Curated annotation (Swiss-Prot):
It comes from Homo sapiens. The lineage of its organism: Eukaryota, Metazoa, Chordata, Craniata, Vertebrata. This is Krueppel-like factor 10. PANTHER family: KRUEPPEL-LIKE FACTOR 10 (PTHR23235:SF64), KRUEPPEL-LIKE TRANSCRIPTION FACTOR (PTHR23235). Gene3D superfamilies: Classic Zinc Finger. It is found in: Nucleus. It comes from the Eukaryota. The gene is KLF10.
Length: 480
């Protein structure tokens, strides 16, 4: 138990007089400073803890940094003042956070931004014209916004049963909370607008709007939605369009990617319009090859090329534009009489004659034997064939039949052998289908053709053909 004497009260009154002599400008400048040094914080704690009892009106303007819970629990033994019991409940630190001021609700009302909020105490958050200090950590434009690392919670517990704060008991606190929320919302909206002005990507960025900055945000959104960014892309490079993690406006934005210009001899190619269509996907990188139109046939309107990707791509969107190939246009082929010829068939007289490769012919198959009789000129492979042919011109018949009483003579030996079969009746050529036999091979060949056409011919024709095959009976050989 501690008892404070007259000396302690006198010391407190002296400090209170020193504090009252300070000008109000220094107090307001103290409140508006974002970062306080340790020495000034200790001085403020000591001065406010001793001077808040006697001058309550001054306390309302400038609330102490440390609440009354830092004092001793035996304050009721001191000679009290009439203003002690009239102190409102929001000056005390309750043993729990008030129900009408939840940190999660305040954080949800704020616009999403990559910032970290640090709350020093509950009493600082209730100041009407002072916003909590912000520590902005600028990240890369691809990273997603992070949630606040700290939340406003009560860490100083007091044994006194303080009345719960509400709109009736603490009107100043309710008004300060509303002002704090409005200031935080304005500050975050302003940060979003500044980030959108600095880093406007290929896709348009439309930050959240607020009533106080409607004109500024509308101008940024209007410029970003109407802009088409033109990139001059060489054939060996790649255009990388990075997207901002801020919310994208509902209407789809277009990116204009122009292929490299062609030389003076060719026709300049038409630009390619690339349009991103929102599509939920897990892959953050979308790679697309844009085929360029042939320069020989430039279209009247640029054909739009549609790509499918995520709504807000977290990675890079690559547009690979190939270098257009200049095709040398050939003049149409015109015939000598002036008519245009079709390119399918070669023009007569203009196509170069290809060298014909003659296959090598066997020397044994060359008709080197030519008949020397005037007006004939026939050629043969063998000399024996040429000799038999010359006998037709001379009339020589060296082969004679040896059958008794037969004096026939032949120019060729095969003709003599065939004639001899007529005397003997020999039929050495037999049909494999009907076992019929023939003296000559050509007769057997003719008979085989009838078997192939037997199904097509009627019976009476077959019979007639058989009658034609009947040969005359050979004359019997005279007996000697």
């Amino acid at each position: 138990m501690l008892n404070f004497g007259a000396s302690l009260q006198q010391t407190a009154e002296e400090r209170m007089e020193m504090i009252s002599e300070r000008p109000k400008e220094s107090m307001y400048s103290w409140n508006k400073t974002a970062e306080k040094s340790d020495f000034e914080a200790v001085e403020a704690l000591m001065s406010m803890s001793c001077s808040w009892k006697s001058d309550f009106k001054k306390y309302v303007e400038n609330r102490p940094v440390t609440p009354v819970s830092d004092l001793s629990e035996e304050e009721n033994l001191l000679p009290g003042t009439p203003d002690f019991h009239t102190i409102p409940a929001f000056c005390l630190t309750p043993p729990y956070s008030p129900s009408d001021f939840e940190p999660s609700q305040v954080s949800n009302l704020m616009a999403p931004a990559p910032s970290t909020v640090h709350f020093k105490s509950l009493s600082d958050t209730a100041k009407p014209h002072i916003a909590a200090p912000f520590k902005e950590e600028e990240k890369s434009p691809v990273s997603a916004p992070k949630l606040p690392k700290a939340q406003a919670t009560s860490v100083i517990r007091h044994t006194a049963d303080a009345q719960l704060c509400n709109h009736q008991t603490c009107p100043m606190k309710a008004a300060s909370i509303l002002n704090y929320q409005n200031n935080s919302f304005r500050r975050r909206t302003h940060l979003n607008v500044e980030a959108a002005r600095k880093n406007i990507p290929c896709a348009a960025v439309s930050p959240n709007r607020s009533k106080c900055e409607r004109n500024t945000v509308a101008d940024v959104d209007e410029k970003a939605s109407a802009a088409l960014y033109d990139f001059s892309v060489p054939s060996s490079e790649t255009v990388i369009c990075r997207s901002q993690p801020a919310p994208v406006s509902p209407q789809q934005k277009s990116v204009l990617v122009s292929p490299p210009a062609v030389s003076a001899g060719g026709v300049p190619p038409m630009p390619v319009i690339c349009q991103m269509v929102p599509l939920p996907a897990n892959n953050p990188v979308v790679t697309t090859v844009v085929p360029s139109t042939p320069p020989s046939q430039p279209p009247a309107v640029c054909p739009p090329v549609v790509f499918m990707g995520t709504q807000v791509p977290k990675g890079a969107v690559m547009f690979v534009v190939p270098q257009p190939v200049v095709q040398s246009s050939k003049p149409p082929v015109v015939s000598p009489n002036g008519t245009r010829l079709s390119p399918i068939a070669p023009a007569p007289g203009f196509s170069p004659s290809a060298a014909k490769v003659t296959p090598q012919i066997d020397s044994s198959r060359i008709r080197s034997h030519i008949c020397s009789h005037p007006g004939c000129g026939k050629t043969y492979f063998k000399s024996s064939h040429l000799k038999a042919h010359t006998r037709t011109h001379t009339g020589e018949k060296p082969f004679s039949c040896s059958w008794k009483g037969c004096e026939r003579r032949f120019a060729r030996s095969d003709e003599l052998s065939r004639h001899r079969r007529t005397h003997t009746g020999e039929k050495k050529f037999a049909c494999p289908m009907c076992d019929r036999r023939f003296m000559r091979s050509d007769h057997l060949t003719k008979h085989a053709r009838r078997h192939l056409s037997a199904k097509k011919l009627p019976n009476w024709q077959m019979e007639v053909s058989k009658l034609n095959d009947i040969a005359l009976p050979p004359t019997p050989a005279p007996t000697q």
